[in-house]
């Protein structure tokens, strides 16, 4: 699952040094602050716009049915990416006859044994992306939850469905042809959530082989 965030600590030593080197009388400092305030306000507004991300589609179910391809894949093997301390390299059978490699930031949460053999749900038409020297073709879907004060991750799985089974909204046409590739911005135009321990989009259930995708521990949270 490649969209899992990796937190980087921020060190504030530069601020202390700047205060020592550029100390000014109160009146002068106030003038400088007055001159720079408009620029800071503009920067904050620009930053806020960037953090908003892509807007959700007006009709999320229709958009999902037309653009986003999910399918079941079986994890055959797992290895650690030596260049990324949180990344697994997962080799999967996606039903196409050719192995698919997906990277996900699950090492802090799940062991290799937890992953091998799982019938996971993947975003299969996301454009390939190189991460830490290895091309990742798609994204593994999961949800998070808290247990005993500790953040944990639960895979979205469909153990009853063979590799390659389409994952669609209830009642949707499984044979509908979707784009071969979409970018992450298009993928993020739909919000997938766990509600009542069931994967849903705008109140409609996600299914594999006509059976709903459910969780056992994650609930009332976003799928990522």
Where on the chain are the PLM-derived regions?
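Phosphate-backbone binding interfaces of nucleic-acid-interacting proteins
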Residues: 1-224
